[in-house]
Amino acid sequence: MARYLGPKLKLSRREGTDLFLKSGVRAIDTKCKIDNAPGVHGARRGRLSEYGVQLREKQKVRRMYGVLEKQFRNYYKDAARIKGNTGENLLQLLEGRLDNVVYRMGFGSTRAESRQLVSHKSILVNGKVVNVPSFKVSANDVVSIREKAKLQSRIKAALEVAEQREKPTWIEVDAGKMEGTFKRLPERSDLSADINEHLIVELYSK
């Protein structure tokens, strides 16, 4: 399945919520009619079935983290094998992806841009180049910008925007050095309340 390369706003309108796919601090403007389906004359959403609600939630989270369908299913299988709450395990696995950690540290303005930084070998993990976006970051790993990439204007711009956002408590960042430490996996209370991971568990449990 190919990665979606179309308009980012269209995906947010499809899911009826801001997926934070576009750069910037502010949420998507209300004039964008996010409650309406995509299209010039996007209709108001009708009532969804139980399955439809579960599917939409899965699609929302998958698109938010920029993960393909097969990858997402594999993350769920891994989460189900880990002791504890499957839904919370799933979110922690997604949060531990290198592209997401780069985004959380503010080196990329979006997860898509962060994924590109990783793929273009601009990111170091514990001093070594890692160019796999799905690389699993562990507690106390140090993630930094490669020396020759530090002059990139987009990284500087992303860090400036990140300064205005609420900083994740599970990550420590030195913007001057362009490096950060992944202190721990986030707790469920650290993450967005707008995600209902229980619906995803119900969907895959059928």
From Swiss-Prot:
Keyword annotations: Ribonucleoprotein, Ribosomal protein, RNA-binding, rRNA-binding
InterPro entries: Ribosomal_uS4, Ribosomal_uS4_bac-type, Ribosomal_uS4_CS, Ribosomal_uS4_N, S4_RNA-bd, S4_RNA-bd_sf
GO biological-process terms attached to the record: ribosomal small subunit biogenesis; translation
Alphabetized GO MF terms: rRNA binding; structural constituent of ribosome
UniProt domain S4 RNA-binding: residue ranges: 96-156
Transmembrane portions of the chain: none
Cellular component annotations (GO), alphabetically ordered: small ribosomal subunit
Presence of the UniProt keyword Hydrolase in the record: no
Function: One of the primary rRNA binding proteins, it binds directly to 16S rRNA where it nucleates assembly of the body of the 30S subunit.
HAMAP family: Ribosomal_uS4_B (MF_01306_B)
Record text on subunit structure and interactions: Part of the 30S ribosomal subunit. Contacts protein S5. The interaction surface between S4 and S5 is involved in control of translational fidelity.
Family per similarity comment: Belongs to the universal ribosomal protein uS4 family.
Name used for this protein in its record: Small ribosomal subunit protein uS4
Record organism: Aliivibrio salmonicida (strain LFI1238) (Vibrio salmonicida (strain LFI1238))
